[in-house]
């Protein structure tokens, strides 16, 4: 995995069968009750951020939160509820092996979501 970045994400809209462009993503490091902002990005036309959220050499062990602001994305579609059912989706996960690549995608519809550790 020597060429892989440390932490990346990808947002897929399975209701429309497309990558979700324009979703604001925030990354925080969590220590106890404290959330420290690391970076913020917006997904591109492929549903990915233009750069890794954390480069491989900068990834540290610990707990992180990815927060996806999905309500604004779903407001643009007639099929979505008004107001949208999902507003913000937060995924909390732990990094143990900093030599690996952590790809944490969000797979969503206007009414549900899922995630997994991808490659």
UniProtKB/Swiss-Prot annotation:
Pathway(s) where this gene product acts: Purine metabolism; urate degradation; (S)-allantoin from urate: step 2/3
Statement: the UniProt record of this protein carries the keyword Hydrolase: yes
Enzymatic reactions: 5-hydroxyisourate + H2O = 5-hydroxy-2-oxo-4-ureido-2,5-dihydro-1H-imidazole-5-carboxylate + H(+)
Molecular functions (GO terms): hydroxyisourate hydrolase activity
The enzyme's E.C. designation: 3.5.2.17
Record-linked InterPro entries: Hydroxyisourate_hydrolase, Thyroxine_BS, Transthyretin/HIU_hydrolase, Transthyretin/HIU_hydrolase_d, Transthyretin/HIU_hydrolase_sf, Transthyretin_CS
Disulfide bond positions: none
Residues binding substrate: 10, 48, 116
Group of enzyme by EC: hydrolase
One Pfam family named in its UniProt record: Transthyretin
PANTHER family: 5-HYDROXYISOURATE HYDROLASE (PTHR10395:SF7), URICASE AND TRANSTHYRETIN-RELATED (PTHR10395)
Similarity-based family: Belongs to the transthyretin family. 5-hydroxyisourate hydrolase subfamily.
Note: HIU hydrolysis also occurs spontaneously, but more slowly.
Assembly mode: Homotetramer.
Full protein name: 5-hydroxyisourate hydrolase
Species in which this protein is naturally found: Deinococcus radiodurans (strain ATCC 13939 / DSM 20539 / JCM 16871 / CCUG 27074 / LMG 4051 / NBRC 15346 / NCIMB 9279 / VKM B-1422 / R1)
């Amino acid at each position: 995995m020597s060429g892989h970045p440390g932490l990346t994400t990808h947002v897929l809209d399975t209701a429309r069968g497309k990558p979700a462009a324009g979703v604001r993503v925030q990354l925080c490091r969590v220590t106890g009750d404290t959330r420290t902002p690391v970076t913020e990005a917006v997904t591109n036309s492929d549903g990915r951020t233009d750069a890794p959220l954390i480069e491989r050499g900068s990834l540290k062990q610990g707990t992180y939160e990815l927060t996806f602001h999905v309500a604004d994305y779903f407001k643009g579609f007639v099929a979505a509820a008004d107001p949208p059912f999902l507003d913000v989706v937060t995924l909390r996960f732990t990094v143990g092996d900093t030599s690996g690549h952590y790809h944490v995608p969000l797979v969503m519809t206007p009414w549900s979501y899922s995630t997994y550790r991808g490659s």
